[in-house]
Design a protein with these regions (language model features):
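Hydrophobic, proline/glycine-rich low-complexity stretches
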Residues: 1-8
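Ordered hydrophobic segments in well-structured contexts
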Residues: 9-13, 34, 44, 111-113, ...
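Rieske [2Fe-2S] iron-sulfur-binding domain
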Residues: 11-130, 341
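C-terminal catalytic domain of Rieske-type non-heme iron oxygenases
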Residues: 124-341
Length: 341
C-alpha cells in the first residue's frame, strides 16, 4: 500500500468529465467504485460491487427522485442504492441500513478530490482553484490507465531529459537547456528551454496544427507531489495551463488524464482548443508507450545531467508522509510568479 501513498489526496475527476445521472466506474488504491452526479451537480461514490451478488453497479443506470436526487441501480436485479448505500428490498417498502460505505469526496468547485479510505496526511493543493479562477476550461483528454506503478509514472513525468526521445516524433526536440529548479518540499518548479528542429513547409501544410509549434519551447513545470504537474505555456494569442493528473488505481496500474485551461489574448485563441487538446493527447500516448517498454526494477547505472526532478520525486516518495527539508534548488532564475489574470 505504501507504493500508493495512503493519505495523499487524489483528483478523481472534474465535473465536466461526468454526464448527469450516468454511472462511471473508477479505481483508487486497489478498490473499485461507482461515481455519479445528479441534476443538481451533487457527486456521490460507492463501492462498485453490489452487496447482493457482486454485479458492477457502474454497468447499471440512475433513477431520479422528484427532489432531483438520484440512486444508482444494479444491472442484475435492479436494486437501487442511494448515496448512503441504502436500498429498499422488494416487498418491504422500507429503506435498509447502509449496505456499503460511501467513499468520502471533497468537492472544491468542479474538482472532485478524495483521500480514499485513509486519513489525510497532507493538504489538498489549492493551485487548481487559482487556475480555474484566472483561466477558462478548454476540456479534458487522454484519460487512460497505464500498467505501471505510481513511482515509475512520476519519474517519467519529472524526467527533464526524456522529451527529445519519447516526444521526438511530435516536437523534434534537439536538446534540453535547463535553467532552474526550485525545491519547495512537496511543491517544485522547473524551467528549461527546448530548441526544436523545424518542420518543412509541405509538412505543415499537410498538418496545419504544426504551425503552432514554436522554434523553442519555453517550459515552466509546476509540480505538486504526488498527483499534479502543470505545464505553463504561452503562444501569441494566449496562455495555457496543461494539468496532468495521476491516480494510483492499484500497485501496478496508474491512471492519468489531462485538464486543459486557457487564458485568451485574442478571440481566435478559442478556436485552437481542440488543437491544444490533440497535442496533449499525443504527449500522454507517447508517455504511455515508452512506459510499456521499460524493464521493471532494472538498475540505473548511468546518471544524466538535469535529473534533479527524479531526485525530488524519489526523496518525497521515500520520506512520505514526512516533509524533508528542501535541498534540490539550483539555477539563478527568479522565483516562480504568482497566478495573475
Amino acid at each position: 500500500m505504501q507504493s500508493m501513498l495512503p493519505g495523499a489526496p487524489w483528483l478523481l475527476a472534474h465535473k465536466s468529465m461526468l454526464s448527469t445521472n450516468q454511472p462511471r466506474n473508477f479505481s483508487l488504491q486497489g478498490n473499485d467504485y461507482v461515481m455519479w452526479m445528479n441534476a443538481a451537480g451533487e457527486v456521490h461514490a460507492l463501492p462498485n460491487t453490489c452487496p447482493h451478488m457482486g454485479a458492477m453497479l457502474s454497468e447499471g443506470w440512475c433513477e431520479t427522485a422528484a427532489d432531483g436526487t438520484s440512486q444508482v441501480v444494479c444491472p442484475f436485479h435492479a436494486l437501487a442504492f442511494d448515496a448512503q448505500g441504502c436500498t429498499v428490498l422488494p416487498g418491504t417498502h422500507k429503506k435498509t441500513l447502509p449496505q456499503m460505505s460511501p467513499l468520502d469526496l471533497i468537492i472544491q468547485g468542479d474538482f472532485i478530490w478524495s483521500y480514499g479510505r485513509h486519513a489525510p496526511a497532507m493538504s489538498i493543493p489549492t493551485i487548481l482553484n487559482d487556475v480555474a479562477q484566472h483561466y477558462h476550461l478548454i476540456g479534458h483528454t487522454a484519460d487512460i490507465s497505464i500498467a505501471t506503478d505510481l513511482l515509475t509514472m512520476l519519474l517519467n513525468m519529472h524526467d527533464y531529459n526524456h522529451q527529445n526521445g519519447t516526444h521526438r516524433d511530435l516536437f523534434r526536440i534537439t536538446e534540453v537547456q535547463f535553467q532552474q529548479f526550485v525545491d519547495q518540499g512537496y511543491e517544485s518548479h522547473a524551467y528549461y528551454d527546448l530548441p526544436t528542429a523545424s518542420y518543412r513547409w509541405h509538412e505543415k501544410l499537410r498538418q496545419p496544427d504544426l504551425f503552432l509549434l514554436p522554434k523553442t519551447i519555453h517550459a515552466h513545470l509546476e509540480n505538486h507531489f504526488p498527483s499534479l504537474v502543470i505545464f505553463h505555456g504561452e503562444v501569441p494569442m494566449g496562455k495555457v495551463a496543461q494539468c496532468h493528473l495521476f491516480i494510483p488505481e492499484a500497485d501496478h496500474r496508474t491512471r492519468t488524464y489531462v485538464l486543459l485551461f486557457g487564458q485568451s489574448k485574442h478571440p481566435a485563441f478559442h478556436l485552437l482548443g481542440s488543437t491544444f487538446l490533440n497535442f496533449s493527447q499525443v504527449v500522454v500516448e507517447q508517455d504511455a508507450e515508452i512506459l510499456s517498454q521499460l524493464y521493471p526494477d532494472s538498475p540505473q547505472k548511468i546518471k544524466l545531467n538535469n535529473e534533479v526532478g527524479l531526485d525530488w520525486v524519489k526523496r518525497n516518495f521515500a520520506s512520505f508522509p514526512e516533509v524533508v527539508e528542501p535541498n534540490f534548488s539550483k539555477g539563478d532564475r527568479t522565483q516562480p510568479a504568482k497566478m495573475t489574470a
